């Protein structure tokens, strides 16, 4: 164990501000109105407002990682007669397929490969051929590769065919501008420790209230019952059904203040985008190649091919970077040898410049 603080170049958990960390130094009572009404309800309102200005949406907070909320939505939104089309081009789309299988949810997995953008015409053909499909689910920012998926085009299809639309916006909400009403999203899922720049501990769902109200009695789980969690928060003014992660919630409330201070989602998106472009330009200058073409990249995380030099080992490269205060991510692509570098969190232009200098120093195979 070390007390050293590293700059996390990961898609979350990520480097947080000192003030977000300090917000956790306060202990809260989960029954107290100062906490439930003064903090939790304020967060719920702020999240809904960030997602859309349209009426008819609500938000639910849920203990656990982002995957808990994905499973809660799938397990609560789909009834026994329903079927979901899962658009998958990475580990997180594949995880939705696995969840659906374990819960006995009828599903059609459209796997377009890890480095391919989903083909909207192919999705159209699937929907046209199978009228039993009632829901569509997909990942927006697929951090397996750094791919940004076309949720707008798929949303238009969902609307045209009258399907319920579920979007895993884990690594995009708060960092990429969006209006879920315009995008025809019925359930948007994200997490505290991503682009809002809080710490791990809970996820959240922003949902069309009419859709959520229809989920009563559907859940395949007690603790992941999205409807029951929502009703508890609605009826008890922010009260969680089970133990609330109070310190994480306080950190998130502070993170929302800092998002507003930065200039909102548009300003944060601009910073992330500039970080990513500077990173890619600098890495290419050092001889690295990106897994994806530029037009496919999200501004969140980038996958780079590993050097072909026989001396290269990711573990050694990682160690040398960590010694200089930087932590990067191993690859998750099954068909290619890659590593990944994220650029979200408390990461600014000077940090990217310092990282590139550290990478040059860590390239032991070039010496």
UniProtKB/Swiss-Prot annotation:
Keyword Ribonucleoprotein assigned: no
GO MF entry, a single one: 2-aminoethylphosphonate-pyruvate transaminase activity
InterPro entries tied to this protein: Aminotrans_V_dom, NH2EtPonate_pyrv_transaminase, PyrdxlP-dep_Trfase, PyrdxlP-dep_Trfase_major, PyrdxlP-dep_Trfase_small, SP_NH2Trfase/AEP_transaminase
Cofactor needs: pyridoxal 5'-phosphate
Residue stretches in coiled coil: none
EC id: 2.6.1.37
GO biological process, one term: organic phosphonate catabolic process
Reaction it catalyzes: (2-aminoethyl)phosphonate + pyruvate = phosphonoacetaldehyde + L-alanine
NCBIfam families attached to this UniProt entry: PhnW-AepZ (TIGR03301), PRK13479.1 (NF010006), transamin_PhnW (TIGR02326)
Family that this chain belongs to: Belongs to the class-V pyridoxal-phosphate-dependent aminotransferase family. PhnW subfamily.
Protein name per its UniProtKB record: 2-aminoethylphosphonate--pyruvate transaminase
Organism from which the protein derives: Salmonella agona (strain SL483)
Species lineage: Bacteria, Pseudomonadati, Pseudomonadota, Gammaproteobacteria, Enterobacterales
